[in-house]
Amino acid sequence: MINLILLGLPGAGKGTASERIVDKYHLTHISTGDMFREAMANKTKVGLEAKSYIDKGNLVPDEVTAKLVEERLSQPDIKEGFILDGFPRTTVQAELLDGITKRLKKPLTNVIALEVDEDTLIKRLSARYMCKNCGATYNKLSKQPKVEGTCDRCGSHEFYQREDDKPEVVKNRLEVNEKMNAPLKDFYQKKGLLTVINGEQTPEKVFEDIDAVLSNNQ
């Protein structure tokens, strides 16, 4: 069984890598954003608790997020293992996750960090733009529409760039994220779970390196 956390700054390629890992290893992809939406829609006890904070514009406390993660990891669909997306973000959350995986007897097997130079990340993120009509995401470096100037999904010709994808904003976002990411890497390094992979490579080569690490668990 593979129970995995994928770490990396925005633009490091976690989304693409996650899809490939899920396809090959049949892991359950667990996103905290999706969990919150699902729990609130289903009006579960933890979902309602989280909603009470969100409705007031407050951050959801770590303990509530951890309860939600534990609820999700307890579900029967996690047979082959899981890949966690968006949790933990801090060492406090990592400690809480430790407790959860021990209680559920589903220990983490791997923590993989995708390392990409800041300049590359800024280039990647500030190349992103979106369809004004349907929100489809494109990238000037890696994912242009099939027909230039026409959205693949809805056929619209209007595009825009989000404020937080502009270079100066991207730089600030990366600095904030790195402050959170570095202690997490140290935390898992000390536990002997961390593997660092060069995220500057092609998506195919990145997955090849991840695959080499994960195949040792089978």
Curated annotation (Swiss-Prot):
InterPro entries: Adenyl_kin_sub (IPR006259), Adenylat/UMP-CMP_kin (IPR000850), Adenylat_kinase_CS (IPR033690), Adenylate_kinase_lid-dom (IPR007862), P-loop_NTPase (IPR027417). One of its GO terms (biological process) is AMP salvage. It is found in: Cytoplasm. Residues 127-165 are annotated as: LID. Zn(2+) binds at C131, C134, C151, C154. It catalyses: AMP + ATP = 2 ADP. ATP binds at G11, A12, G13, K14, G15, T16, R128, T137, Y138, Q201. GO terms for cellular component: cytoplasm. PROSITE patterns: ADENYLATE_KINASE. Residues 31-60 are annotated as: NMP. The keyword rRNA processing does not apply. Gene3D superfamilies: P-loop containing nucleotide triphosphate hydrolases. GO terms for molecular function: adenylate kinase activity; ATP binding; zinc ion binding. The keyword Nucleotide-binding applies. Consists of three domains, a large central CORE domain and two small peripheral domains, NMPbind and LID, which undergo movements during catalysis. The LID domain closes over the site of phosphoryl transfer upon ATP binding. Assembling and dissambling the active center during each catalytic cycle provides an effective means to prevent ATP hydrolysis. Some bacteria have evolved a zinc-coordinating structure that stabilizes the LID domain. Belongs to the adenylate kinase family. Catalyzes the reversible transfer of the terminal phosphate group between ATP and AMP. Plays an important role in cellular energy homeostasis and in adenine nucleotide metabolism. Monomer. This is Adenylate kinase.
